[in-house]
Amino acid sequence: MHKFAIEVSSLIKNFGRTKAVDNISFNVELGSITALLGGNGAGKTTIISMLMGLLVPTSGSIRILGNDIAKNRYSILPQVNFSSPYVDLPNRLTVEENLNVYANLYSIEDVKSQICSLSESLNIKNLLKRKTGHLSAGQKTRVALAKALINDPQLLFLDEPTASLDPDTADWVRGYLKDYALDKGATILLASHHMGEVERLSDFVFMLQAGKIVDEGAPKTLIKKYGRSNMEEVFLDVARGRRSKDMKEN
């Protein structure tokens, strides 16, 4: 049994002369909720795209659930999924039709039961007969999450999971994701620049800047390490080039 859901070694991704991901290595423990935290251009989405096999690394290795994805990518597909509010769902299909399409891709045995269960737990049952193109941004975010959970994934990738949601709904979604990870023993890797979300949701954080991991740790550990009161203050310190050792010296 492998200890880590994700194992990354010496990962590099270049786009022409631009180094989007600069020689990073990290592991994500099974059953954890781990965040990639960084501003725009930090490399979060590029990293997740490589982990999912959507982008080929310039160099380095990636193992997902014990499998080297360069050699065995397709064997992991039934066990993983992805959600992002920035990925469009077919507007001409109803929510139910969209979920049916994705359920069939994963060969779900009891599609009707799975859709019913997800729609109830994510509060989208009243949206099932509506066309996706007629939904609000927040409603689309919840539907995208239902799509990502259709196969009960053991590894879930999330890109800004609560974008476009009002504060109450966003907080509810975070609680839902925590319960999902706990109940299913699933691993979640999320990319975010929402400091409060990372602080409340994550067990562990990798802080990114210009394609590099500049610090890592549990949110409470990082807050204590930097002598700050929350992750937003920690993030600002890192963004401004200050490190924990600098603050101890000052």
What are these model-predicted stretches?
Residues 100, 104-127:
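Conserved ABC ATPase "signature" region
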Residues 216-217:
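ABC ATPase "signature
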Residues 152:
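Conserved catalytic motifs of ABC-family nucleotide-binding domains
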Residues 171-183:
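Helical segment within the ABC ATPase nucleotide-binding domain
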Residues 156-160:
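Catalytic Walker B motif of ABC-type/P-loop ATPase nucleotide-binding domains
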Residues 131-135:
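Conserved ABC ATPase signature
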